[in-house]
């Protein structure tokens, strides 16, 4: 029991130091306590959490995930799966056990604001990266 408490204390201390040292990790949604040694997806790189866009211009979001087997990425906007259409493009590139995806909305409108999610899934689990978008005039 004491060794489990020490491990938990060390993990919390490491997270605290990481947040204090690296400003990019200061958002709680960027912290990842998942054990990825079993091959479950890991979000390795992504756009920043908060994204502002100008109405009528382009919004670009990026998400990269690795795992074994290689994860599949699905994008959601306000809880609904994003499907490519006249102003939404989704691109993928694959390198070994890593998949990268770009979501592009061009031109943007008021309805494009809100929460987006990049969901990486394989047989061993899922990982979600959230983005919050808002428009400017």
Swiss-Prot record:
Tissue-specific expression: Expressed in DD and VD GABAergic motor neurons. Expressed in a subset of head neurons including M2 motor neurons in the pharynx. Expressed in coelomocytes.
Disulfide bonds: 63-118
GO biological process: neuron remodeling
Entry coiled-coil feature ranges: none
The protein's name: Immunoglobulin domain-containing protein oig-1
Subcellular location: Membrane; Secreted, Extracellular space; Cell projection, Dendrite; Cell projection, Axon
A GO-annotated cellular component: extracellular region
Source organism (scientific name): Caenorhabditis elegans
Residue stretches making up the Ig-like C2-type domain: 41-133
Name of encoding gene: oig-1
């Amino acid at each position: 029991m004491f060794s489990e408490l020490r491990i938990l204390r060390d993990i919390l201390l490491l997270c605290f130091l990481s947040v204090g040292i690296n400003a990019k990790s200061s958002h709680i949604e960027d912290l990842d306590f998942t054990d990825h040694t079993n091959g479950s997806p890991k979000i390795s790189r992504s756009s920043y959490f908060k994204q502002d866009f100008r109405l009528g211009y382009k919004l670009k979001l990026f998400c990269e995930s690795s795992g074994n087997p290689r994860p599949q990425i699905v994008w959601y906007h306000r809880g609904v799966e994003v499907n490519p259409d006249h102003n939404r493009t989704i691109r993928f590139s694959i390198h070994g056990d890593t998949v990268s995806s770009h979501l592009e909305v061009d031109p943007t409108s008021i309805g494009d604001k809100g929460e987006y999610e990049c969901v990486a899934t394989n047989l061993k689990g899922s990982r979600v990266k959230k983005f919050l978008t808002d428009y400017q005039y």
